[in-house]
Amino acid sequence: MTILRKSHPIMKMINHAFIDLPAPSNISGWWNFGSLLGVCLIIQISTGLFLSMHYTSDTMTAFSSVSHICRDVNYGWLIRYMHANGASLFFICLYFHIGRGIYYGSYLYKETWNIGIILLFLVMATAFMGYVLPWGQMSFWGATVITNLLSAVPYIGPDLVEWIWGGFSVDKATLSRFFAFHFILPFIIAAMAMVHLLFLHETGSNNPLGIPSDADKIPFHPYYSYKDLLGALMLLAFYLTIVLFFPDCMGDPDNYMPANPLNTPPHIKPEWYFLFAYAILRSIPNKLGGVIALILSILVLALFPLLHTSSQRSLMFRPISQVLFWLLVSDLFILTWIGGQPVEPPFIIIGQLASILYFSIILVLFPIAGLIENKLLKW
């Protein structure tokens, strides 16, 4: 008689994905971020569900309802801050996860990588719409500025913006639809994450050496299930430290003021996790050019598999590419810093140089470094 987990139709699927899954024996802590993203998504959906029970998506009462959640609902303050900081945590894990994929050449699993890029777009859209819901000053003006970018689309731009707004400005209709989309998108993300996992399990995981590991596989459980559990506990410790001791450290003080269409905040800026893309957007003086650069700053990830010129998969033994990778990471930190600064010298030129460097490293320097390293191997 076979074990139930190997014969039952539903348990069989779980078994193949999380128990008897053959995994490389040498994958490091950088491979923990996939499961940590799953934990983040579960936290966000759970806390979001409870918040939605008390939130009202009306311009007159949205700000008050968030205040009511924090003041009058049992542990409402905790749920609200868990949800707000959970978004930051989600993006921290997401950027580590993408960085791991670039460093170890995981992007060569093209289907998994491309679905990951779609997931990134979905998560960014969800986070943006969620930031609008508390209806504070930065919520309102952030929504106005970002949705206004669509007016740069030739010919249909102005109509497109009014269609998304549901009127002639960001108002009640906009808030209602953003709430509806913000509620449904995480479930679409969860479904897409399953497809992401499905394609990953078609090929099996990559490993730090970037070489086939078929000769040396170990079962996912107990080895990596316990490793992921340890990672999740470390993540939760960090997460709860932020939520309980520094709940507002990643927020904007302007968002504690109710939305006022007649009063513009001195510096309109998105949450920290969008600042790098915002800096790239602002570094181009032309509106349409800026919007294209903004979209390309994420879409450029899809070119990684096409621009892979090295005969090795991982950067483990490629010192020139390693230097470029860490230069790219440093450049993203600079872009994040610039995105939060006002548009004035010397920040303008620094942002423009950092934007040029960002695209140059990915589109030009990485492929050239790969070819040079191939030559060095034969030398």
From Swiss-Prot:
Residues that bind heme b b562: 83, 182
Cross-referenced PROSITE patterns: CYTB_CTER (PS51003), CYTB_NTER (PS51002)
GO molecular function: metal ion binding; ubiquinol-cytochrome-c reductase activity
Pfam families: Cytochrom_B_C (PF00032), Cytochrome_B (PF00033)
Topology versus the membrane: Multi-pass membrane protein
Transmembrane domains' residue ranges: 33-53, 77-98, 113-133, 178-198, 226-246, 288-308, 320-340, 347-367
Keyword Translocase set for record: no
GO cellular component, one term: respiratory chain complex III
Signal peptide positions (record): none
Note in the entry: Heme 1 (or BL or b562) is low-potential and absorbs at about 562 nm, and heme 2 (or BH or b566) is high-potential and absorbs at about 566 nm.
Entry function: Component of the ubiquinol-cytochrome c reductase complex (complex III or cytochrome b-c1 complex) that is part of the mitochondrial respiratory chain. The b-c1 complex mediates electron transfer from ubiquinol to cytochrome c. Contributes to the generation of a proton gradient across the mitochondrial membrane that is then used for ATP synthesis.
Entry protein name: Cytochrome b
